[in-house]
Amino acid sequence: PSSSKYHGCVEGGLCQHCLNVYRAAQAELENIKKLGKVDINISSISEDNLIIATLLHDLCKVNYYKKAIKVFKDDATNTWHHYYSYEVEDNFPIGHGEKSVIMLQNFIKLAWNEILAIRWHMSAHDSGIATSSTERIAMYDSMTKCPLVIILQNADLFATYMMEETTDPKKENLID
């Protein structure tokens, strides 16, 4: 799954999400090119950079969720129900973007723009941004120096909220 209760909370959801992010990033890059002169250097983004950053930005979610049976109470009928869902099993508790970068670097050499884009793809949703001005400054610096950061942030948000359906596991996966 791509999450335990939001977008892509289904088997194969992470794969579909990453493909959607890639498609959204491709479209965004094409639209930027159509605008003509813009204040960012998009020529620094190769097709390989786009593929690696978009398809692998959430690598940290592989084996991060495990299947679980959960319980909820239907207040209208005052009955308890079981349903299949997912829960987090984090064996390497480090930041979301950082974890994907670290995992990837065990297998491939990442370009500097891929590292920055994957690290900061969560944007303001990254917990470190809310608590650390140093982290916030680093993210904003990355955004101004590396257009792939903004493209991945936008594509991830677009895929999540505009391309993917949020299902309710309580309704979709009801056992009893």
Model-identified regions with their sequence ranges:
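Divalent metal-dependent catalytic cores for phosphoryl transfer on phosphate-bearing substrates
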Residues: 3-12, 16-17, 23, 28, ...
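Short acidic DE-rich linear segments
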Residues: 41, 175-176
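A short alpha/beta connector and helix-capping loop motif
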Residues: 74, 171-174
